[in-house]
Amino acid sequence: MAVSGSHRPLTGPQAESWTAEYLTARGLRLIERNYRCRLGEIDLVMAEGATLVFVEVRYRSGKRYGGALASVDRHKCRRLLATAQHYMVEHRVTGAVRLDVVAVSPGAAGPQAEWIRNAIEAQ
């Protein structure tokens, strides 16, 4: 997703849309955006083959506070896991699942992504 030729910072929804396109171009299939329940929100629910993939999109326009990945702390991980488990129960998911994080940051030629597969594991 090009942001109309400018190098303006993305908004959260733009970063999520850009990430959905980025992952789709790499073989994943979008199932749902912004799944919400009382426990939290999952930005993207996708599939890679038979594996259900929950995707947390993090965007920071700079590294002042450690960048996008630094914003995924222990509390955020617990909320994401709980929300993913809620989705799995609600949708009767029994197959393989994983939780990925995509950190989006501005680059000279447009957004850049750091995709971490299976970034968050249940303890």
From Swiss-Prot:
Molecular-function annotations in GO: nucleic acid binding
Highest taxon in the source lineage: Bacteria
Matches recorded under PANTHER family: UPF0102 PROTEIN YRAN
HAMAP family on file: UPF0102
Family that this chain belongs to: Belongs to the UPF0102 family.
Protein name: UPF0102 protein MCA0184
Natural source organism: Methylococcus capsulatus (strain ATCC 33009 / NCIMB 11132 / Bath)
